[in-house]
Amino acid sequence: MERGWIAEKDTVNVPTWDEYKGAVTKTQEYAYDDYAVALVAKELGDEANYKLMMERSNNYKTLFDPSTGFWRGKIDDGSWIQDFDPYYPYYQYMYREANAWNALFFAPHDPEGMIKLYPSKEAVEAKLDSLFSEPWRGYEAHNLTGFIGNYCHGNQPGHSIPYTLSLIHISEPTRH
């Protein structure tokens, strides 16, 4: 994690069952884990590790691609993976049991920082609207069920996504 992200191998025509790293998902989840460790360090009075882990908790931002508005994988040299389809359920490649849509908005420890990655709150709202309104493309992956558009309620990391609307002061849809 020296670079702040886990590298994935660059490949094309990725099968959903091959052995990959799930690098985007792991980078996001490790950032959340680092935040939790930072809180423990702070509680123990370990200021040095608190600061280190809080800094590392921002690593999720290293894989945000502003040109697509998605978290996206990188290869070893730091360039974006070129064969990128936000609708494809890579299963292990870049995302674990997910696609780029399902990985949207996973930064439960830093929702405000995540929102700031977008150019405006309106851009966040538009992306959220697209998540729920863009039709699922019918890709088959046995762990992905319970869709509303591309929002997959059957995948735990997405359960907090609807509440992102309330963070941009749009609470009406989250009441339903």
Question: What are these regions, as identified by a protein language model?
Answer:
Residues 24, 31, 105, 152-155, ...:
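Short, well-ordered coil↔helix boundary/capping segments
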